[in-house]
Amino acid sequence: RVADASKSDDSANMLLRDVVTLGRYIGPRLSEYAQKTQKKVDVHTYPSGTTVIKAFTANDFVFLDSKKHIIEDLTTESIKSVAAVKITWRIQKNRQNGQSITLAADNKFPDLCPVLSAACMVIRARRLIQPDDMPLAIYQTRKGERLYLTGGKIAELLRGAVKRIRPDISSEDIKWYSAHSLRVWACVLLDEAGKSPDYIKKRLRWLGDSFRMYLRDTAVIQHQHVDALRLASQAIMDLLSALPEDVIALSHTMTGISIDPQMQEYADEED
């Protein structure tokens, strides 16, 4: 909704839409798409003195058509034939540098397609004359200034969107929405979908089990718990319905029985 209200495809809100849509699939770490400040690029410096840009660049995305052919010239027209995107992490926190993950396009829900959002980010950056080897998450203000996305800006945009949907949200609850929310959200979505821990770790690039701290007791999980015991519940009800009436009556009368406080310990090997 926030993106729909934007008058420019190069606005911060439009960039946010693409980052969120892609983020719900790949669960990016903040440094992988944003900068600490709006005008300076964050780099990692190796002991040798070599530096590498932390955030995604256009060069990290390879777009493929339905026949697995690389789409060299990505435009608003050729974007229609994009069927998948291969994303490469040149550098990341877990040190699995060079890791690649391929995402398939969601043709059923194009507005939520991570592949189209990734393509839009590349097209936007090139439209803003951003070199392919420089950070991809860039937008243009109404005054024509080109700025990098930051963690603070992400939090501001996310909280603004949440307030539009939930105007009664408390000042304390709104603080839970931050740039890190994207990684948490991606993790929760896969957990709700019933994916295994190994699957979650593989697709969201976790080496250990630290992702478990992000799992939430969501409504989806709660209903899954009920559904998981549905057959067992039915079996119990079938068993109860098959009991003789006198046994059922006896069980009902026993529910009102209380413990005799005067009775001492009663020794018996069986409960």
Residue ranges of model-derived segments:
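Extended, non-catalytic subsegments within catalytic or DNA/protein-binding/adaptor domains
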Residues: 1-271
